[in-house]
Amino acid sequence: MGDYMIRATGFNGHVRAFAARTTESVEDMRRRHDMWNTATAAAGRTLTITLMMGAMLKGNESLHVKVKGGGPIGQIMAEANAHGEGIAYVSNPHVHFELNDKGKLDVARAVGTDGFVYVTKDLGLKEPYQGSAPIVSGEIGEDFTYYFVMSEQTPSAVGVGVLVNPEDRSVLAAGGFILQLLPNTPEEVVAAIEERLGQLPQVSRMIGEGLTPEEILDRVLDEPKILSHTEIQFSCKCSADKVVQALISMGREEMEGLIEEQGEAEVHCHFCNERYHYDRSALEDILKDM
């Protein structure tokens, strides 16, 4: 089973919901950036939520997320679009702590609690939408729950988890869900959701046991109606062609100076950790086309 997410409604349309399996995408991120366990959990949770937020968009809309809590992990950056494509990285991927008192990876210690969650949405308008909310726990899921309420005025519940193999650092399971109450939701529906959430196992455990996003929503919603199914992939917008265009945009004089002084160029994409190297011969070929 590959990565995918679903969009659904429940409780007679009073709740909209998103659920995702992101195991392969988070593992791809971990491998590309050589992340240590706690960093993987923090960035993987953020990537999972960002992908589900992408499912709230349409067409060519996209969003950018930044989590900056003042912890040793530094910033977590993530991007996603409406088509299930997302990517994420952290400032310092080599962060790992012992398990916390709940027996879980100590994500809060890595992220920190002195900072904000920032969300920027490109909705095709003149100016992008920008929202933010203080970090309340550093556990990511709780922080985005608070963000939705404070910045987007949408009562929400966010559950997210990443299970990492302690021996080889590989990602065993990753996924999450977002529940959002629509206006005028009856109190009995709110009470029913709260009760079900209180009985729900950890998301990473459910994914690890083979539960699908549909089965996870079955546990928290009353006969959910599936509206869409979108495949997910860890996908970056960088490419060799874009790098060449960036080099061309330097102008002929600056390119000649680069060849003369350095004789080579390397461009590093922070999101996917890809490196594009151009030796003197390659740069001279680009110069000929300018």
From Swiss-Prot:
InterPro entries: Heat_shock_Hsp33 (IPR000397), Heat_shock_Hsp33_C (IPR016154), Heat_shock_Hsp33_N (IPR016153)
Keyword Cytoplasm: yes
Principal location listed in the UniProt entry: cytoplasm
Pfam families registered for this protein in UniProt: HSP33
Keywords per UniProt: Chaperone, Cytoplasm, Disulfide bond, Redox-active center, Zinc
GO cellular component: cytoplasm
SS bonds (residue pairs): 236-238, 269-272
Compartments it resides in: Cytoplasm
Modification(s) after translation: Under oxidizing conditions two disulfide bonds are formed involving the reactive cysteines. Under reducing conditions zinc is bound to the reactive cysteines and the protein is inactive.
GO MF: protein folding chaperone; unfolded protein binding
Source organism superkingdom: Bacteria
GO biological process: protein refolding
Family to which this protein belongs: Belongs to the HSP33 family.
NCBIfam families for this protein: PRK00114.1
Role this protein plays: Redox regulated molecular chaperone. Protects both thermally unfolding and oxidatively damaged proteins from irreversible aggregation. Plays an important role in the bacterial defense system toward oxidative stress.
Name this polypeptide is given: 33 kDa chaperonin
Gene behind the chain: hslO
